[in-house]
Amino acid sequence: MAVTKELLQMDLYALLGIEEKAADKEVKKAYRQKALSCHPDKNPDNPRAAELFHQLSQALEVLTDAAARAAYDKVRKARKQAAERTQRLDEKRKKVKLDLEARERQAQAQGTEEEEESRSTTTLEQEIARLREEGSRQLEEQQRLIQEQIRQDREQRLRGRTENTEGKGTPKLKLKWKCKKEDESQGGYSRDILLRLLQKYGEVLNLVLSKKKAGNAIVEFATVRAAELAVRNEVGLADNPLKVSWLEGQPQGTVDPSPPGLSKGSVLSERDYESLVMMRMRQAAERQQLIAQMQQEDEGRPT
């Protein structure tokens, strides 16, 4: 990968939307999220998609290699410090600073800020060249995961359209758990926790927690298969089990199973979800009317 002047001037952390001290795992996760959204295969009408995707790939290579990242951070820090100093100076003080630096350059044989940044830039170029020679296995793996995710998304949408052609609409389940009305922790089940438990079975289109009845929620899945898996396998938290039952869209010939056990292999692993379902895109914006309708039905249903 040839280093470009553009790359040296870019803020790679801002490009990926991460903090400067982000760990490798956070860097890779941010890359997958950004790269998936701008992948050329998903943005054929965007002429800059390929360029941005390439920049993200370069950022991943630099920030996941310790030596290359250290060299880049040094360049970035020097550039940031210089910008901050320049910003604090008015025109008159800036002229004094420039005159002083000119005299220092004449008196000193080495060690100016410009030379230090130049040396750091050279080191960064060398590290990037080394990455090119060794081959970027991490980049190839991340791009493979993105391609796999795109394929999974397409198959999921096709399956969802096929399963829902009977005119029953999308499947909806009712969730119940023990929760006192004044319990601020909601019995241990927040919206984020419920989503984490349910999304491993398939795409969740909507999740509505009842404001009137504590310990009640309604979830809408994109496919019948995902809803069936959730009904069959999900048990919730060990200290406060979750009861999952059909509300709408139950296939004919099936019955609600008894509460499942925690047998090995009965629940999809978090690692499977992390690698294959992490980037699943929800369609919440188009379904606000359905959310309101479910809330009205839930509030009007007797306890």
Curated annotation (Swiss-Prot):
CDD domains attached to this UniProt entry: DnaJ, RRM_DNAJC17
Pfam families referenced in this protein's UniProt entry, alphabetically: DnaJ
Domain RRM: 178-249
Primary localization: cytoplasm
Modified sites of kind N6-methyllysine: K264
GO biological process: negative regulation of transcription by RNA polymerase II; spliceosomal complex disassembly
Chain intervals for the UniProt region annotation (Disordered): 78-124, 150-170
Keywords, comma-separated and alphabetical: Chaperone, Cytoplasm, Methylation, Nucleus, RNA-binding, Transcription, Transcription regulation
InterPro entries reported for this sequence: DnaJ_domain (IPR001623), DNAJC17_RRM (IPR034254), J_dom_sf (IPR036869), Nucleotide-bd_a/b_plait_sf (IPR012677), Pre-mRNA-splicing_ERAD (IPR052094), RBD_domain_sf (IPR035979)
SMART domains, per the entry: DnaJ
Example of a GO MF term: RNA binding
Positions of the J domain: 11-76
Lineage: superkingdom: Eukaryota
GO cellular component: cytoplasm; nucleus; spliceosomal complex
Record keyword Amino-acid biosynthesis present: no
Ranges of Basic and acidic residues composition bias in the record: 78-106, 150-166
Keyword Hydrolase among UniProt keywords: no
Subcellular location: Cytoplasm; Nucleus
Biological role: May negatively affect PAX8-induced thyroglobulin/TG transcription.
Protein name per the record: DnaJ homolog subfamily C member 17
Organism: Rattus norvegicus
The encoding gene: Dnajc17
